[in-house]
Curated annotation (Swiss-Prot):
GO MF terms, alphabetically ordered: histidinol-phosphate transaminase activity; pyridoxal phosphate binding
Binding partners and assembly: Homodimer.
Organism listed in the record: Vesicomyosocius okutanii subsp. Calyptogena okutanii (strain HA)
Gene name for this UniProt entry: hisC
Catalysed reaction equations from the record: L-histidinol phosphate + 2-oxoglutarate = 3-(imidazol-4-yl)-2-oxopropyl phosphate + L-glutamate
Protein name as annotated: Histidinol-phosphate aminotransferase
N6-(pyridoxal phosphate)lysine sites (modified residues): K215
Length: 354
């Protein structure tokens, strides 16, 4: 037995590392990234701005300027606290670290895989409630789970990833008001939705929101934020590692996130293309296509694995979810540019000989 195998926690040896597929020379439609790169003009301005980054110095420990930039971009009320993370994953882990060893984390399935992974990393007990066949939360089942497991944390993606739907608001409110747990609503796709719980933080002291800039064009920055009451943020900030937002992310985000008109214009294009792509998929009769309020679409397809491989062979990478709970024969495609979406549709139509 090697040194690392004798040294490592036994439960860590039993899990697999998060897998990111090779995507070189492919149209990437698998990771819910924005398809839009910076314009040449904006790139030139950005590079000029970046010159002032003092790489020999540690970054601002509290990221105050970036905090204000994000508040303006997302219209976050001044009375709420904001905590920044190196991606939302760091903030999910920070919340888990605030729990006692053995506490229970509750979520729904299928949902964002990192809730369960981070729970296991931090030696907490992970429990989940299966969604209905229509990917909704059954209120009675969730309430029963809350009473049975007495969770310390409840994670709910709103809208849900990978299904793309918004859960019933009244059910979410019932969950928040009926538990002593901290309820974390992950609004990663807030820009593409018709609803948000942002202002509800004033009503529910146990409500925390997560957001990210990854889905609005800046996945490479690895920047997430936690929004909650100021008291909650003050306490959670004790667990934040020092200098967790590096200088390049701070300087880049402070410049790029002020381009609100460009960000909103790109979001509008994606919303329009989401409808175009949805309509095109619905016309392929063998597919079952699920409505989405995110920047991706989930669909169920015959010969799932063969279609997935056929798309890769033709230069398009999407996400194969067919082995996940409740997602048998399901694939997920990220909304791309008009050209990328058309290429994807053409390949799917060719596969089914339409």
């Amino acid at each position: 037995m090697s040194f690392i195998n004798s040294w490592l926690r036994s439960d860590i040896k039993m899990i697999n590392a998060y897998h990111v597929p090779i995507s070189a020379d492919m149209v990437k439609m698998d990771a819910m990234e924005s398809p839009f790169s910076l314009s040449d003009e904006l790139t030139d301005q950005y590079l000029t701005y970046l010159v002032d980054a003092q790489l020999n110095r540690y970054p601002s420990p509290s990221s105050d300027k970036l905090n204000q930039t994000l508040r303006l971009l997302m219209n976050i009320p001044k009375e709420f606290g904001v905590l920044l993370g190196n991606g939302s994953d760091e903030l999910i882990q920070l919340l888990a670290l605030a729990c006692n060893t053995g506490d229970t984390v509750l979520s729904v399935e299928p949902s964002f895989v990192m809730y369960g992974m981070i729970t296991k990393f931090t030696r907490l007990n992970y429990q989940s409630v299966l969604l209905t066949d229509d990917f909704e939360i059954d209120d009675d089942t969730m309430q029963k789970a809350i009473k049975t497991y007495n969770p310390k944390l409840i994670f709910i993606a709103y809208p849900n990833n990978p299904t793309g739907n918004m859960f019933n608001r009244e059910i979410i409110e019932h969950i928040i008001s009926s538990t002593k747990a901290m309820v974390v609503l992950d609004e990663a796709y807030y820009a593409y939705t018709t609803d948000s719980f942002l202002t509800d933080i004033a009503k529910y002291p146990n409500l925390v929101l997560l957001r990210t800039v990854s889905k609005i064009g800046f996945a490479g920055l690895r920047l997430g934020l936690l929004i909650a009451t100021q008291d909650t943020v003050n306490q959670l900030n004790k667990l934040r590692l020092p200098y967790n937002i590096n200088i390049l992310t701070q300087v880049s985000a402070n410049f790029l996130l002020q381009e609100k008109n460009t960000i909103n214009a790109n979001v509008s294009v994606i919303l329009a293309q989401r409808q175009v792509l949805f309509d095109a998929l619905v016309k392929i009769n063998v597919l079952k296509v699920y409505p989405s309020q995110a920047n991706f679409i989930l669909f169920k397809a015959p010969n799932t694995n063969i279609l997935f491989d056929f798309l890769k062979e033709n230069g398009v990478l999407i996400k194969n979810l067919s082995v996940k709970k409740k997602l048998i024969n399901c694939l997920r495609v990220t909304i791309g540019t008009e050209e990328q979406n058309q290429k994807f549709i053409n390949i799917v139509e060719k596969f089914y000989i339409l």
